[in-house]
Amino acid sequence: MPGRAPLRTVPGALGAWLLGGLWAWTLCGLCSLGAVGAPRPCQAPQQWEGRQVMYQQSSGRNSRALLSYDGLNQRVRVLDERKALIPCKRLFEYILLYKDGVMFQIDQATKQCSKMTLTQPWDPLDIPQNSTFEDQYSIGGPQEQITVQEWSDRKSARSYETWIGIYTVKDCYPVQETFTINYSVILSTRFFDIQLGIKDPSVFTPPSTCQMAQLEKMSEDCSW
């Protein structure tokens, strides 16, 4: 998605985005401990809204967006944020409906709409149960620290990982997800300002202009 990364198998880019790009794209209570005291993946919240900053190696840019994540219904909405005036930069809204297998791209200014097929299956924004625990540490300084855990898809058969996820120990909120290929970062997404729940479920409903949507993705620059 214009938000999340490729599936944890790293592949073609959820550049269907999302969270484009999208798809870099979790939340519970204290991670439970196994019989030998080894940390276990926590359960991330399934419905929340927040903001994200996503870096894509292909473009060399950071993009900011508002994010609505509904894991229960397998849908995501990403709304590009304008933080500075960039000539010929178009802002879009992306609505990804995985149960229907479609993604809508809507121009925020004109409401022009594109409808595309989602070729990748739903990949929840969370810590897979077969993940490898890497580390636990604090972010910030005295009186302002947040304890997080770092997980990856590294296995004993190989020494490196292609996915790294950082989540808070308390409430299991996503902090950052990073995808790599051959030791190079291809996609990295940071999450912040998270609020539980979906304030307005209608954000997942495409506008009426999508009833006559074109079938090709719109360009992000001025080449209309």
Curated annotation (Swiss-Prot):
Annotated compartments: Lysosome lumen; Secreted
Pfam (any one): Ependymin
GO cellular component terms listed in the entry, alphabetical order: extracellular region; lysosomal lumen; lysosome
InterPro entries registered for this protein in UniProt: Ependymin (IPR001299), Ependymin_CS (IPR018224)
Major location (coarse): other
Domain of life: Eukaryota
Glycosylated residues (UniProt): 130, 182
Disulfide bonds: 42-172, 88-222, 113-210
Similarity comment text for this entry: Belongs to the ependymin family.
UniProt function note: Binds anionic lipids and gangliosides at acidic pH.
Name of the protein in question: Mammalian ependymin-related protein 1
Organism: Homo sapiens (Human)
The gene coding this protein: EPDR1
